[in-house]
Amino acid sequence: MKYLHTMIRVFDLEKALDFFINKLGLIEIRRKDSEKGRFTLIFLATAENEPTIELTYNWDQKEPYTTGRSFGHLAYQVDNIYDTCKKLQENGVIINRPPRDGYMAFIKSPDNISIELLQKGEPLAPSEPWASMPNTGDW
């Protein structure tokens, strides 16, 4: 058995692509438009031949999707948690759970999907402004 992807329904495709590609740094692997089914599938990953997330955009969706408590979050390992969070914050992304411990942070996608960011290797030394930054909202 081989893990392939996780599917996320998105309400605003352009906002979702801006977030996942321009802000989070994923790349588009492939795309499929179905005129008959009236949907678009876009597969994103950290690199070629890596597991993907599938963004599903239903063309006729009128209301934003809601998420239940059965789905938790996506998680990505990053080379430098502080640099990643700073870049995201500079691009308008709210850091819901700052990396106070130098290891873990949480953000949310435009469709309210929680995303965990984990420092590669050992935690970095606690550093300001992150060490004293409060949580914002939930994650």
Features from the language model and the residues they span:
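N-terminal beta-strand motif that seeds the catalytic metal site of vicinal oxygen chelate
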Residues: 1-17, 71-76, 121-139
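Core segments of cupin and vicinal oxygen chelate
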Residues: 7-50
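Vicinal oxygen chelate
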Residues: 29-32, 82-139
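Short, charged/polar surface micro-motifs in flexible loops or helix N-caps
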Residues: 47-51, 60-62, 77-81
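Short, structured motif recognition centered on aromatic/hydrophobic residues
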Residues: 53-55, 71, 115-117
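Acetyl-CoA-dependent GNAT
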Residues: 57-61, 119-122
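A contiguous binding-surface segment within folded domains or other stable secondary-structure elements
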Residues: 60, 64-73, 93
